[in-house]
Structure formats: structure tokens, C-alpha cells
């Protein structure tokens, strides 16, 4: 299974989608930051035509709807696009529950969107470029569908501490079982998107101007039970890449118990897991 197959298969499964809400404690930390850095709330462009690309369960769209003035939302158009029907079902419920105005959900393949040329004033891609099967193709699509003067705003992970926490838990299992470091985990995804210079170069090569790539650190904490769910969303897709079949047969069934025990021993039975991350917030203008 290729890198892209592993990621794409993961996003399509029901168990992953069901648990994805817990990741918003992590990814959602940056939704407001991404919207703020895009300048969308202060732009003179009217009407706004916005694509939340690879929208997941709608964290960025939710922030947009809470941030923009009612006057702007009277004339704007928001499209929440994702390739996962399960994600879009959750986003659609959120759209209805929160009363988003002039918004729609749509199946969108970020690599080949089928959306019109030069159409959008803003395209948001929150933590998508590291997961796309072809990040360069997705970036070209963003450039193509943006109108002149349009803004691309994206977030990508530079570093975070949750993979090291999982690794420490797995290492309590006897047998010297392998588990990726943070660097090895990031290497499973598209290379370069954790580097300011790489991102700036890629956007400028394509024609973006006024490119800014800013590292933004954040800290939070979440209950053990929620962090456990995040781990169990990710670990089943990592073990086949790092464990032999024999190791999986012998130890995979023990992972949930071992993980929970490690978290309770480390942070207390009802404790909070401290999470730290740095994301790169990127903005670029299409001339």
C-alpha cells in the first residue's frame, strides 16, 4: 500500500470519521488562526466566494460563519468540499445546526476539483496538503480556481507531541516493537510541507505573490478518553507499516489496553493529556 493509499483509505472509513471529531481539539486550534491570517474578514472583495477545500467536518467553515459580519454573508457563497462522504455528512449537520448562510457541501477531489477557473476569492486548505495523494496537483488546482486577487490560506503541521506520546506507550510492550518517531510519521505524508522555505518556493514557482509562511505554536490539553480515541484512529493504520505480521498477531490486540494504562499512569486516571504543536500558516495571493 502506497503512502497515499494508506491516507486516503483511512479518511474513508466510518470508524475514522466517527472519531474525527476528537481531532478538532487539535486541528481546530488553528481554524481561527487560519481565518484571521487570511484577512477574509477585512477584505474589500465583494461578494466573497469561498471554498473550504478538504473541509473535514467543517472547522474552518464554522469559524468563518462566526467571524464574518452578517452583511458579508448576505452576498457570499461558501462551498465546503471534501472527498469523504462521511465527513460531508457531518459538515452538513453542522451547517444546519449552526445556521450557516449561503453554504453548501459538495464532493470535491482536491486534485481535480471540476470547479470553474478564476472563481473563488478565498480558498482554505486546513491540514490538507500533507495528506493529498499529489500535493502539487492540489496546489495547482487552488491556483487555477482562484480569481485574480484571490487568497490561498493553508495550514500544515511542522511538529507536534502526540506521536511521541503514542510511541512511549507502545514501547512499554515487551519485544522492542517499532513505532515511528515524529519525523518518520511526517515522512509518511507529503515531504516538504513542514518547511517554511519549501512551501514558499512551491507557491512562488506556481505564480503566487506576497507569500507568507508563519510558524504558530499552540498548546492545549484534552481528557485521556478523548486522546485515546485520537490514538485509536491513527494507530491501526500505522502498525501494518511498521510491524511484521507476526508482531501484529502477537501484540496488536494488547495495544488499546497498554495505551490506556500508559495514559492513566502518566497523567492520572482522570487526567488531561498536554498537547503541543507548531503549525505553518501560509497565505499567498494570485495576481
Curated annotation (Swiss-Prot):
Location relative to the cell: Cytoplasm
Disulfide partners: 55-80
Gene name in the database record: tmtA
Keyword entries, A-Z: Cytoplasm, Disulfide bond, Methyltransferase, S-adenosyl-L-methionine, Transferase
Sites where the protein binds S-adenosyl-L-methionine: 27, 54, 82, 87, 109-110, 126, 248
Pfam family, one: Ubie_methyltran
Protein name listed in UniProt: Gliotoxin thiomethyltransferase GtmA
UniProt function note: S-methyltransferase that catalyzes the irreversible conversion of the secondary metabolite gliotoxin to bis(methylthio)gliotoxin (BmGT). Gliotoxin, a member of the epipolythiodioxopiperazine (ETP) class of toxins, is characterized by a disulfide bridged cyclic dipeptide. Its thiol groups are essential for bioactivity, as they conjugate to sulfur-containing proteins, disturb the intracellular redox equilibrium, and generate reactive oxygen species by cycling between reduced and oxidized states.
Outcome after substituting residue 162 to A: Abolishes catalytic activity
CDD domains from the UniProt entry: AdoMet_MTases (cd02440)
The protein's enzyme class: transferase
One GO CC annotation: cytoplasm
Organism: Aspergillus fumigatus (strain ATCC MYA-4609 / CBS 101355 / FGSC A1100 / Af293)
Classification via Gene3D superfamilies: Vaccinia Virus protein VP39
